[in-house]
Amino acid sequence: MKKEEIRNCLNTLYDAQSLRIATSNRLLQIFSKKFEDDNEKPEISLEKDILSEFEKINTYKDEQSKSIKKSISDLKTNFITSEEEYNQVKAYIFLLESEKTYTKLLQKAVENHPVYINFLTDIKGCGPVMAANIIAYLDPYKARHASAFHKYTGLDVVVSKDKNGEPITDEDGNFKTHGRSRSDTEEYEYTNKNGELAIKKGLTYNPILKSKLIGVLATCIIKAKDPVYSKIYYDYKFRIQNMPKHKDKSKSHQNNMAMRYMIKQLLTNLWVYWRKAENLAVTESYAVAKLNMNPHGFNY
């Protein structure tokens, strides 16, 4: 399946997911109001309390051949106390099933894609939905260097500037940098609705993809103990914990630095594989080509 079709499947899944989450929040709000006057307001669980009660009503209704209204009355349920509420929960379950269907369609589409088959499936912690995000939004034809993948996912660094827009330097005269965020906007070229090149100021990266890679994939890889990338994470984390420049930073800061480094290495390897698979030129990284540094994993 083409990446455009995977992107459409992915967006449809997230639309369904957003509607399901909004509906679940609304249901919890509705059922929580029943206990507003209680001194000890219970913590309501959608799965444990409401959905299990829904199944209980269904089972009783079928076994006793009674109406929904009569079943609710006989069971003296705590949460679902009317046929209207029963139907609202029933509609929510339909949303759950729809989301599962869209997930299966997306998985089927991704599992036939060569990038998933030959690269992403080997990474422990990277499932089909995460793979879909990567395949749908990264383009090896547009990315002439691995750093383009880093920039598009917001994992490049930005030179820090003062209030006058001047670069800030440290005591050694080196530019101070920071991780890219939503406040870091730049002018860039884009194709307008008339098909013409134009310039506008805005984000140069995909914030949603960044949050997926750092907030979800990175932690999944570490928990799954992927033999390649979790090692990169722990090696880099140990390294910065012993560097004078970084050793006094908080543990969470060091953890975030190590996760970003790990994902950047993953994206670099992905870029190399994908460019070769598409018979496109592959270049050395900036650190190797321009700074004469050894590549990651070099045996010193």
Per-region residue spans from a language model:
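Long, charge-rich intrinsically disordered scaffolds of nucleic-acid metabolism proteins
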Residues: 1-112
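Conserved aromatic-histidine-acidic binding/catalytic patches
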Residues: 4, 8-11, 15, 90, ...
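Short, hydrophobic/amphipathic alpha-helical patches that form generic packing surfaces
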Residues: 4-25, 29, 132-137, 211-219, ...
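Eukaryote-specific, cytoplasm-facing alpha-helical/coiled-coil scaffolding segments in long proteins
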Residues: 42, 238-245, 288-300
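Coiled-coil termination/hinge junctions
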Residues: 98-131, 135-140
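Phosphate-backbone recognition surface of nucleic-acid-processing proteins
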Residues: 119-120, 134-256, 260, 273
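A glycine-rich phosphate-binding loop feature that marks nucleotide/adenosyl-phosphate handling sites
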Residues: 125, 166-167, 172-175, 286-292
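Basic, amphipathic alpha-helical segments enriched in Lys/Arg and hydrophobic/aromatic residues
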Residues: 250-287, 295-298
